[in-house]
Amino acid sequence: ITTTLMGEVLKQAGHNVEYVQADYIAQFAGLETGDLHVAMELWETTAREAMDASFATGNVVSMGETGMMAIEEWWYPAYMADRCPGLPNWEALKDCPEAFATPETAPLGRYLGGPVTWGGFDDERVEALELDFEVVHAGTDAALFAELEAAYQRQDPIILWVYSPHWAPAKFEGSFVEFPPYSAECYNDPSVGINPDAAYDCGKPTGPIWKAAWSGLSEKWPDAAKVIENFKISNADAAGMVAEVDLNGKSIEDTVAAWMETNKGCLLYTSDAAD
């Protein structure tokens, strides 16, 4: 959605745009060779290492933040707050794991993590923070949020991995758990953090969602580069568009067009040159 929105803004500024699908990490190789020109949604939480490696080649440059902030963390519906007093402070989970238990995990609480391929170190986090929870991984992104939807409708116990921007925190009332703040040292040095004997005794990293481009972009299309650098969108606006597509069945193109019509005054671009 962010890519389409950026593309449509560029079109309004008089530029020709071609959309190319690329693997999340493999796209950096395309940017380095100049086969791809812009990547619009690089999460600090998952792409930092790949970004740094590409920037080091000199062939890829940062185009700044998108305005969105990446959040990936344990999340619980608002109705669970009464069942586990003290939330969103993580220490409340030490006192009420049974509030999140299921017949399969009792007496342990059940935490629904993302697919194993997402990483996230939730098993390590549970052990390091001495939480009486069992980590269960959803098979897919769709399965993760389908389970949330079903639990929310029945007011069933659930705590799970949610990320933002996404439609889930826009649709469902709830909160992210507040763990001890993330630091690289917390992940790498057991002596750092509240548990001196274990790493991962803190929350997941958060940070900006970035734009990146082939280093030759600003010379070949200077006006387009300015448009891309100026582009900003909020988590709320992005999540709203994701909800329109995923929940209401609208096409990405129609959703982007509607947002642009409503937010004409927010679009920053110049049109003194076109490609």
Sequence positions of predicted segments:
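Short, polar/charged alpha-helical segment
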Residues: 1-16, 126
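Ligand-binding pocket segment of bilobal, Venus flytrap-like solute-binding proteins
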Residues: 36-40, 110-188
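A bilobed periplasmic-binding-protein/Venus flytrap-type ligand-binding module shared by bacterial periplasmic
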Residues: 72-83, 207-220, 241-244
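Conserved small/polar residues in nucleotide/adenosyl-binding loops
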Residues: 269-275
